[in-house]
Regions:
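Small-residue-rich segments of transmembrane alpha-helices in multi-pass membrane proteins
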Residues: 2-8, 31-37, 65-74, 156-167, ...
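Signature of multi-pass transmembrane helix bundles
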Residues: 50-177, 182-188, 200, 332-341, ...
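Transmembrane helix-loop junctions in multi-pass membrane proteins
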Residues: 7-21, 46-53, 76-88, 112-113, ...
């Protein structure tokens, strides 16, 4: 509720309205392949140890809370800055930053720009501090021991190596092709300087093709998310196979694909984000009230696991590229829509299962 109220306040302020897409997207990018498995394990472990909840899925819901607070923090920061800094100062600082970047473009690049060293450092930084903190809590605070030390060390080593390689692949592969594709997509329905054949199709056909591409991108990228696979396996294990992993993954992927398609439609038709986001959240809240705890916990956690290291680089790059090419006010907001739609999709699936059981 506080987030919705702050979003409404920002929406009514012309100077703050453009921050809404960024703020809601921040909630979608905070939970990734490192955070989600850890948070899921902690929530389930604490719930089982404390004996809280009547359901095996009562430990879910922590990922949702972890996704909401970044939105709240960005909105509060934006409101604070709006009261302490004038729009003219912000514009001047942005112009100075652009000039600095332009001047640095002519300077010889450093080793960080010529090699994937920064991606490797970020991969190590993503896991190593967290591992050290968990070791401190386990050994010093809880005075416990680590079973299967060799297996755990082997797994942690592979995790760090895998994250480093994954970061390099994202930077030089998915991120680059996502930005290029997003910049070229508007050529399907409008004239662009980068394409001599634009517009390639009539406007109506081109718009349908772009939105259809966004739908397929969302569906395929979501199925490839490691965090969603981890969530599906956890749910299937806790419910002894009653809640199939494939059933959850396909319903979540369908919701994300619809959300990304709506986000692209927002950019193409320059629609207002809050008029699309608020009704979906109201629908989600209404369905939450009438759904069972099992589906509510899983549904709201699915919002945090769908926007991970595969989806985010592609969608952000495509959204910003499409927004710049189509001269949209801002290219953010796609991830926010991609987060709420799977919640509605999983809750709808849960209500359908409940209705079928009653019949």
């Amino acid at each position: 509720i506080p987030i919705v109220l702050l979003s409404g306040y920002c929406w009514l302020d012309p100077n703050l309205r453009s921050i809404l897409g960024l703020a809601w997207d921040c909630g979608a990018v905070t939970t990734g392949p490192v955070t989600v498995p850890l948070v899921l394990s902690l929530g389930i472990g604490i719930a089982n140890a404390a004996g809280k909840g009547d359901s095996s899925l009562s430990g879910f819901g922590v990922v949702t809370v972890a996704s909401l607070f970044p939105i709240l923090a960005v909105l509060c920061l934006a409101i604070f800055v709006s009261y302490t800094v004038s729009p003219e100062q912000i514009i001047a600082a942005a112009s100075a930053g652009k000039a600095l970047i332009a001047s640095q473009a002519t300077v010889e690049t450093s080793v960080w720009d010529k090699t994937p060293l920064i991606e490797i450092v970020l991969g190590v930084r993503a896991i190593l501090p967290l591992v050290l903190f968990l070791m401190f809590v386990l050994f010093i605070v809880l005075r416990s021991t680590l079973p299967n030390k060799m297996v755990t060390t082997y797994g942690l080593t592979l995790s760090i190596l895998g994250m480093c390689i994954f970061n390099v692949g994202l930077t030089y592969g998915l991120g680059a092709i996502g930005a290029q594709t997003g910049s070229a997509l508007p050529a399907a329905f409008m004239e662009l300087p980068i394409s001599q054949f634009s517009p390639i199709y009539p406007e109506a056909v081109g718009v349908v093709l772009v939105i259809g591409f966004a739908w397929l991108l969302g569906f395929g990228a979501t199925l490839a998310e490691p965090a969603l696979n981890a969530l599906g396996l956890t749910v299937q294990s806790l419910t002894n196979g009653a809640f199939k992993k494939s059933m959850l993954m396909y319903s979540v992927a369908g919701g994300v694909s619809v959300g990304i398609a709506l986000g692209v439609a927002k950019l193409v038709f320059t629609l207002d984000l809050m008029t699309m986001l608020l009704p979906l959240y109201l629908i989600g809240i209404a369905m939450t009230v009438v759904s069972t705890e099992e589906f509510v916990n899983v549904a709201w956690d699915s919002a945090g696991v769908t926007t991970g290291p595969v989806t985010v680089p592609l969608v952000l790059a495509m959204g910003l590229g499409l927004g710049n090419a189509a001269s949209a006010v801002e290219g953010f907001g796609i991830l926010a829509l991609a987060s709420i739609c799977p919640i509605v999709a999983v809750l709808s699936m849960g209500l359908a299962i409940q209705l079928r059981q009653k019949m």
